[in-house]
């Protein structure tokens, strides 16, 4: 599976060719720094790694700087990663955000299948999490021990709402 930075780069390149500086400007304009900080060095190094894996290539349009474009292999890897992210529940909610942001790489059938699988996972996860919370409440466990579980229930509810609107 791709790293978070790789997902962002490939997702941005799905929209068209860009150099690293333009990608950094786009990331900044999306206010990603608050939930997924990507510095210049990380972006440049990740571009080089993606190029070595043949997920992106230099278009050769500029002598002064690399202008990257996504390859078919890169599109397929991004698609596989987005599908994999829909099929897992993670405490790190950035993964789901990235899956949603770049879900337009999926065709309608792939997206619907991914959404259905995600919804089933969330239903199962929510049920188990609520049962755990209820047991803790029955045993009069202090709220400080329950608050993380409450947070996860809210996250599941928000993700379900997101899926319904996607």
Across the structure, where does each feature detected by a protein language model lie?
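Basic helix-turn-helix/winged-helix DNA-binding cores
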Residues: 1-90
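Heptad-repeat amphipathic alpha-helical coiled-coil interaction surface used
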Residues: 112, 119, 123-126, 133, ...
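Amphipathic, well-ordered alpha-helical segments in soluble domains
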Residues: 19, 23, 46, 125-129, ...
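Positions in alpha-helical segments
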Residues: 7-11, 98-101, 147
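Acidic interhelical loop/turn segments
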Residues: 130-148
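Amphipathic alpha-helical dimerization/coiled-coil segments
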Residues: 81-127
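Hydrophobic recognition helices of helix-based DNA-binding modules
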Residues: 78-81, 129, 166
